[in-house]
Regions:
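N-terminal low-complexity, acidic/polar interaction/targeting segments
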Residues: 1-240
Length: 240
């Protein structure tokens, strides 16, 4: 693992994989503050699947493994922020830094929510932070170690992945009534977009074919390419 750093955390019922592109809508004050900090400093954040079994100052905590997210596009529409992100490096959390304030559902925060669903402005919220707090952010952060990995796969594994993926994509093509005369060409064009001989090939396949949180998290938490390959093949076999 590489030297540890501190990352802001976006905690969601979601798993991001390296090389995967996702869109997020940001409207909560804590994440609007986080987005401002990231955009101002040109920094990334960590996207981590939430863990309902552990809380930090009333907020759901993160699972142990996450993925660094780089912001590649941002736009604002009213009070909502829309960002496009790409997963970069996997990391393991060493220590969570709890947010300065609890959720609005906490009794101490009730005065800030006169109407359900209407958030107060950020300055008003920040005034509630106790002076003795060392950490003055509304969002969780964590000290993390980035996971160094070389996801090299053999030619045999690549061929097996390609064959299994072709079967899945061909099944999709049949289900959406792609013309049989161009079906093979349609399948091959999609294979070319997904399978590349680089370190993100395994994650590209996983991002396209695996939607279950538990399955994606299993892949995120593994550092051995053979284990990741086996997990993907198991899921591809189930789809076919």
């Amino acid at each position: 693992m590489s030297a540890g750093v501190t990352l802001p955390l976006f905690v969601l019922p979601m798993v991001l994989l390296p090389g995967e592109i996702q869109q997020l809508r940001i409207f909560e004050p804590r994440y609007r503050q986080m987005l401002d900090d990231c955009l101002l400093d040109g920094k990334s954040f960590g996207l981590v699947c939430d863990d309902n079994e552990e809380t930090f100052n009333g907020w759901n905590g993160p699972k142990s493994f996450g993925c660094e997210a780089e912001i590649i596009h941002h736009e604002t529409m009213g009070s909502n922020h829309f960002v496009e992100i790409i997963g970069t490096r996997k990391f393991k959390i060493k220590e969570v830094i709890e947010p300065a304030l609890p959720p609005f559902s906490d009794q101490s925060m009730e005065e800030l929510m006169p109407e359900v669903g209407i958030y107060p402005d950020l300055d008003t919220i920040l005034e509630k932070i106790p002076e003795d707090k060392e950490y003055h952010k509304l969002y969780l952060a964590a000290d993390v170690d980035f996971i160094e990995e070389e996801n090299e796969i053999s030619e045999v594994q690549l061929e097996e992945l390609t064959s299994a993926l072709k079967s899945v994509i061909k099944s999709i093509g049949n289900n959406i009534n792609v013309d049989q005369e161009i079906l093979d060409e349609w399948v091959d064009s999609r294979i070319e977009m997904i399978i590349k001989k680089d370190e993100d090939t395994l994650y590209s396949i996983a991002a396209m074919t695996i939607s279950g949180l538990e399955q994606k998290y299993e892949i995120l938490s593994k550092s051995d390419s053979d284990e990741i390959y086996d997990e993907i093949m198991t899921n591809l076999t189930k789809i076919v």
